A protein has these predicted regions:
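Chalcogenol-based redox active-site neighborhoods
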Residues: 16-178, 183-186
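Extracellular/secretory pathway and lumenal proteins
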Residues: 12-13, 67, 197
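Single conserved hydrophobic/aromatic residue that forms the stacking wall/gate
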Residues: 1-13
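Disulfide-stabilized, aromatic/cysteine-rich ligand-recognition loop
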Residues: 183-200
Length: 200
């Protein structure tokens, strides 16, 4: 019997090692995009850029690794906005084979979790490829000059349960970027289910 997206992802997350993000390529410039948000607006990098930095997150609706840290992401992004860092989330998964990641479900997911940041759809997957995004969630933290300074995790997960022992790695790193324009030297990779690439 065929498995729906989340079941497949959960199966993958228990039996297959999650994909880890590569080491931060410090100084790499952010790439421009023009993508539709769940509110029906076409947004570019210039539209979402923050005064002190910008956080670009590749996520999706169904992945258990994303769901495990959604609460942290939402809370962290609110705190970051207060210090001049804007955030944006992008879903690039193949919605045809993973209907839980459809645009309609993106709208639902963003409302249910009270996203205070835009949630964009990358239907062609071009932007995910340009950024070399590998998994969900995959975080790209940029300084005010749009130079990459963070490519790490939100926080530690034990069996898909967040270890909440103070501020998250993501929040601490982005706060440091807001203050110094530089991310931490030591970063622990994010990990999750691979982006669901289209096969045709």
């Amino acid at each position: 019997s065929s498995l729906v997206g989340s079941e497949m992802c959960i199966r993958d997350s228990y039996y297959i090692m999650p994909i880890q993000t590569p080491i931060c390529d410090f100084g790499q410039k952010a790439h421009d995009f023009k993508l539709k948000s769940t509110e029906g607006k076409i947004l570019s990098l210039a539209d979402v850029k923050g005064e002190k930095g910008t956080l670009i997150m590749f996520i999706c609706n169904h992945c258990p690794y994303v769901k495990a840290v959604t609460k942290d992401i939402v809370e962290d992004c609110k705190k970051l906005k207060d210090v001049g860092i804007n955030s944006v989330a992008i879903c690039a998964n193949d919605a045809e084979n993973y209907p839980e990641d459809s645009f309609e479900n993106m709208i639902k997911f963003s409302k249910e979790n009270q996203f205070s940041f835009p949630y964009l759809v990358d239907e062609t997957q071009e932007i995910a490829k340009t950024y070399d995004a590998v998994c969900t969630p995959d975080f790209f933290g940029y300084n005010k000059d749009l130079e990459l300074q963070y490519r790490g995790r939100v926080r530690e997960l034990k069996k898909l349960i967040p270890v909440r022992d103070g501020d998250s790695d993501l929040l601490k790193a982005m706060m440091q970027i807001a203050e110094t324009n530089k991310g931490p030297e030591h970063q622990i990779p994010s990990a999750g289910c691979g982006i669901k690439w289209k096969t045709n």
